[in-house]
Amino acid sequence: MESGDEAAIERHRVHLRSATLRDAVPATLHLLPCEVAVDGPAPVGRFFTPAIRQGPEGLEVSFRGRCLRGEEVAVPPGLVGYVMVTEEKKVSMGKPDPLRDSGTDDQEEEPLERDFDRFIGATANFSRFTLWGLETIPGPDAKVRGALTWPSLAAAIHAQVPED
């Protein structure tokens, strides 16, 4: 029997359009200390061009009259960041998908299910981004820094241990 919380969770199968990874263009990213309550396209490049200045403690910028302080954060070596989007178009069930990557014909695939299968693709890539904090630099305790340590931690945990 499922609890009320579990019943409300939507389950999806996510398919990556790997060809979009090759076509993704480099992007400049800013991770802001706020939430934008809009889900849709916005002409950000037209209205958000930060005048970043080097302050005594790092990068500084004003956003809607508030002082933000930040620093450049590099993606861990050997990794690349991608900006991903969910495709909005409905895939015809039972018909071949013209956008599907070639080279996967020898793999057996499950049939697609309407409202269950989702497709994502990359629109941009990045190797660094600017991490902003409100009034102070986020510092080493920022959650994003913890997330960026996971790949190296996972590699260390799963590495072969030499027998003595």
UniProtKB/Swiss-Prot annotation:
Main location: nucleus
Phosphoserine: residues carrying this PTM: 3
Keywords noted in UniProt: Acetylation, Aicardi-Goutieres syndrome, Disease variant, Nucleus, Phosphoprotein
Positions of modified residues (N-acetylmethionine): 1
Protein's cellular compartments: Nucleus
Tissue localization of expression: Widely expressed.
InterPro entries for this protein: RNase_H2_subunit_C, RNase_H2_suC
Start-end of Basic and acidic residues biased regions: 91-103
Entry GO CC: nucleus; ribonuclease H2 complex
GO biological process: mismatch repair; RNA catabolic process
Region: Disordered, residue numbers: 91-112
Note: The T6 pseudogene located upstream of SRY on chromosome Y is derived from the transcript of this gene.
UniProt disease annotation: Aicardi-Goutieres syndrome 3: A form of Aicardi-Goutieres syndrome, a genetically heterogeneous disease characterized by cerebral atrophy, leukoencephalopathy, intracranial calcifications, chronic cerebrospinal fluid (CSF) lymphocytosis, increased CSF alpha-interferon, and negative serologic investigations for common prenatal infection. Clinical features as thrombocytopenia, hepatosplenomegaly and elevated hepatic transaminases along with intermittent fever may erroneously suggest an infective process.
SUBUNIT field: The RNase H2 complex is a heterotrimer composed of the catalytic subunit RNASEH2A and the non-catalytic subunits RNASEH2B and RNASEH2C.
Family: Belongs to the RNase H2 subunit C family.
Record function comment: Non catalytic subunit of RNase H2, an endonuclease that specifically degrades the RNA of RNA:DNA hybrids. Participates in DNA replication, possibly by mediating the removal of lagging-strand Okazaki fragment RNA primers during DNA replication. Mediates the excision of single ribonucleotides from DNA:RNA duplexes.
Protein's name according to its UniProt entry: Ribonuclease H2 subunit C
Source organism of the structure: Homo sapiens (Human)
